[in-house]
């Protein structure tokens, strides 16, 4: 069968993409179906190009994906949603119907079929045209018009080009900062927009692979329905009441009410999801879970539910280390924080399962004076893990000796086909398909349709196109193998969108018509308009106009449907008018290429002012904060790089324009990568691979089969990375560089000194204060 980079279903591609991105250790021989592996690897290499890497591994070469989430203008994995396969009739009817319906009044299916034959000589049966119009009505691209007994159709009125520029800038931001960002990517592709203003931190790109499952759950929540989920060979049904996000762990969960209790289902383990019957008790179940939520620490729901106390006392250097108390208030998930005159800090929290708090508690390794709690098993594990860490890092140089060099990208080796075997189909016959989730993956929004639309638009604007111009544009806008697969049907007339002109030119047979926004895209925009961050981009009057334009459109999701349980409790003041004014001034300076004079308070409490050359606005999904990445531009002063928290800027004034070359973003100051040795204990390898996925990572298999992870990071993120490594305790081991190993060693040694290994005594299930 001829290779195609397009697919009918995402089931298999979703599986392989997750493997390549998170578990990039596996070689071809570790997959059951060698031929399927070859095809899917080739497709993903075509979609993602230079991000794919091959590294030597025992038994062959391992394929992995290395993406720097903090440096991507948008999620490269959104390409997955633009790969739906189609037929000649699909693409031809798409453009012919758009042209036909844009030129007059509404048409019935038989009238449209007659017009297609008369105007373009393309003969389609009335039934075929009727099915396509009905399909597009469900997508929201056309509207049904009541006309007596006959159904007539017209184009939906709102197109992407009708949106105001301020709203489109918001789309650039929310494409990464809100769920279902692939819908924003569609709008960007329709207009040829590129996000040049924003970058994102703590962004888990892999989440998009599970968006069809998430949308089915949220649709069921909005309609008060049950769902039927297929999980790795078993079927589960229940009533979804909320979606939980872990912005540090990287995991996403659906909360289902099953029987008499709530169950958390990891979205990445769901093969397929379908809508079930209405649940008359939905609202009562939602309220019951909302009442439980303050008692949870994360994604653990032990039964019977209990409440366990945890009390931790930390040592600091008083005001010099005020940031420790601030971090506890920001990340302590509602726990009480008491600062004492002697510089110690008391943190207290009640949780239904205090074992879940261990990773957070370990991030304060080197500062803990005492740790007490009701759960003796949790306390014993904390002390046991501390002993193990002390043994791991007891000798200077104990880590670096085992450190392997960073894996280098190997040449693209020719892959031969071996075994073959289809992957099990994830579809289930139970329940009803979610049409909204199906509309996420549809050929009308695919890359090939976008390319064809841009070629027609260019021909409208510039006249007949040469083969070289078409080839150049297809290579620019398509995937790696799109030119090979798309050019023949365009040039040879299989898709008669163009006809041969004089010489070698191509003349369009139809007009370029902008595709209307789909129902899903309009609903996504309606949800964004309810977000408090939208006030940063739109003045009140512009926000009112945007809401009027989308009047009657139900938001795709509600804020009450989603809960990021580990998001910072100290976000930027998005509703504050002074903050909004500063944000818009900074945004204008970036957009127009102008210097910025700013006065702000540094993290050490010092007042700073001066001229700055803005580079990017960086948004942290975990901290819910904006930071300005800029360079000092005062004459006679060093031009060092600055990272400024936007909430600390008290005054911002636009300056003069600067040359485009000056605005070019410098590469981040990268340090030698941290190398971790991963273990399988307590699922540590899987947890670590996802936890660190917001950094650019390169997996490697050592000569003895050990799993290594090379983490690349910016110098300014070193303390954060240290904290995140400490959260894993002895379950990961830092092998290098020696400077980073020494930082961990100092923390562990100091912690052992402070506690003196005062571990609790008693049985594994004993409880009591320690």
Give the location of each predicted region:
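Eukaryotic partner-binding/assembly regions in large regulatory complexes
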Residues: 1-61
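Core beta-strand-centered patch of the WYL/Sm-like small regulatory domain
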Residues: 30-37, 192-310, 408-428, 556-675, ...
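Short helix-coil junctions and helix-kink-helix linkers
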Residues: 24-34, 114-124, 472-479
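Bulky hydrophobic/aromatic content
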Residues: 13-21, 48, 94-96, 100, ...
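Short amphipathic alpha-helical interaction segments
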Residues: 32-43, 122-135, 483-486
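Polybasic (Lys/Arg-rich)
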Residues: 18-22, 26, 190-192, 276-278, ...
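Well-ordered mid-protein domain cores that form the structural environment of catalytic cofactors
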Residues: 70-130
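Short alpha-helical segments that sit at the start of domains
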Residues: 1-9, 72-98, 429-451
């Amino acid at each position: 069968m001829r290779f195609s980079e397009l697919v009918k279903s995402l089931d298999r591609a979703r599986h392989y993409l997750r493997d390549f991105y998170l578990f990039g250790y596996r070689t071809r021989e570790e997959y059951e179906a060698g031929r399927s592996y070859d095809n899917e690897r080739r497709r993903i290499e075509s979609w993602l190009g230079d991000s794919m890497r091959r590294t030597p591994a025992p038994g062959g070469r391992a394929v992995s994906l290395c993406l720097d989430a903090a440096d991507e203008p948008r999620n490269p994995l959104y390409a997955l949603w633009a790969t739906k396969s189609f037929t000649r009739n699909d693409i031809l009817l798409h453009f012919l119907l758009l042209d036909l319906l844009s030129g007059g009044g509404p048409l019935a299916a038989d009238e449209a079929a007659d017009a297609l034959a008369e105007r373009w000589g393309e003969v389609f049966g009335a039934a075929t045209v009727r099915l396509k119009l009905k399909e597009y009505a469900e997508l929201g691209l056309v509207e049904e018009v009541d006309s007596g007994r006959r159904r007539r159709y017209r184009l939906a009125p709102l197109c992407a080009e009708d949106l105001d520029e301020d709203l489109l800038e918001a789309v650039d931001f929310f494409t990464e900062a809100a769920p279902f960002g692939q819908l924003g990517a569609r709008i960007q592709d329709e207009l040829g927009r590129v996000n040049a203003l924003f970058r994102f931190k703590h962004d888990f790109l892999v989440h998009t692979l599970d968006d069809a499952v998430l949308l089915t759950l949220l649709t069921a929540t909005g309609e008060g329905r049950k769902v039927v989920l297929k999980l790795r060979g078993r079927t589960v049904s229940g009533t979804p009441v909320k979606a939980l996000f872990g912005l540090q762990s990287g995991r996403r969960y659906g909360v289902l009410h099953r029987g008499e209790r709530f169950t958390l289902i990891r979205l990445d383990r769901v093969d397929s999801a379908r809508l079930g019957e209405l649940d008359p008790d939905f609202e009562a179940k939602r309220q019951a879970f909302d009442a439980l939520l303050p008692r949870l620490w994360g994604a653990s729901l032990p039964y019977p539910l209990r409440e366990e106390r945890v009390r931790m006392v930390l040592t600091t250097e008083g005001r010099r280390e005020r940031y420790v108390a601030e971090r506890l208030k920001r990340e302590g998930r509602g726990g009480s924080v008491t600062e004492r005159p002697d510089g110690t800090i008391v943190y207290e929290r009640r949780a239904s399962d205090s074992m879940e708090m261990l990773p957070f508690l370990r991030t304060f390794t080197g500062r803990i004076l005492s740790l007490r709690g009701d759960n003796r098993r949790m306390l014993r594990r904390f002390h046991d893990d501390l002993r193990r860490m002390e043994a791991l890092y007891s000798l200077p140089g104990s880590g670096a000796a085992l450190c392997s060099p960073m894996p280098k990208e190997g040449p693209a080796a020719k892959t031969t086909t071996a075994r073959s075997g289809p992957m099990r189909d994830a579809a289930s016959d139970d329940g009803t398909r979610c049409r909204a989730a199906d509309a996420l993956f549809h050929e009308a929004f695919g890359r090939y349709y976008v390319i064809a639309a841009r070629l027609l638009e260019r021909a409208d604007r510039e006249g007949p196109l040469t083969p070289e111009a078409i080839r150049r544009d297809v290579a620019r806008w398509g995937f790696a193998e799109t030119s090979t697969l798309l050019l023949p049907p365009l040039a040879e007339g299989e898709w008669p969108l163009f006809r041969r002109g004089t010489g070698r030119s191509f003349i369009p047979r139809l007009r370029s018509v902008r595709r209307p926004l789909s129902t899903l895209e309009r609903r996504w925009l309606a949800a964004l308009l309810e977000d408090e961050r939208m006030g940063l981009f739109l003045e009140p009057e512009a926000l009112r106009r945007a809401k009027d334009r989308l009047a009657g459109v139900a938001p795709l999701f509600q804020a009450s449907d989603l809960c990021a349980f580990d998001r910072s409790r100290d976000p930027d003041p998005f509703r504050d008018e002074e903050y909004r004014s500063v944000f818009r001034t900074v945004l204008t300076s970036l957009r127009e290429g102008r210097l910025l004079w700013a006065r702000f308070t540094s993290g050490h409490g010092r007042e700073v002012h001066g001229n700055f050359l803005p580079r990017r606005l960086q948004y942290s999904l975990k901290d819910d904060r904006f930071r300005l990445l800029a360079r000092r531009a005062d004459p006679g002063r060093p031009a060092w790089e600055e990272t400024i928290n936007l909430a600390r800027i008290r005054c911002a004034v636009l300056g003069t324009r600067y040359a485009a070359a000056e605005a070019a973003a410098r590469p981040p100051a990268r340090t030698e990568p941290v190398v971790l040795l991963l273990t399988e204990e307590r699922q540590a390898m899987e947890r670590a691979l996802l936890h660190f996925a917001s950094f650019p990572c390169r997996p490697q298999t050592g000569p003895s089969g050990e799993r290594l992870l090379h983490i690349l990071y910016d110098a300014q993120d070193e303390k954060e990375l240290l904290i995140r490594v400490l959260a894993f305790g002895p379950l990961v081991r830092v092998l290098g560089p020696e400077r980073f190993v020494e930082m961990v060693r100092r923390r562990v040694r100091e912690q052992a000194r402070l506690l003196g290994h005062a571990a609790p005594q008693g049985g594994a299930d004993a409880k009591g204060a320690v």
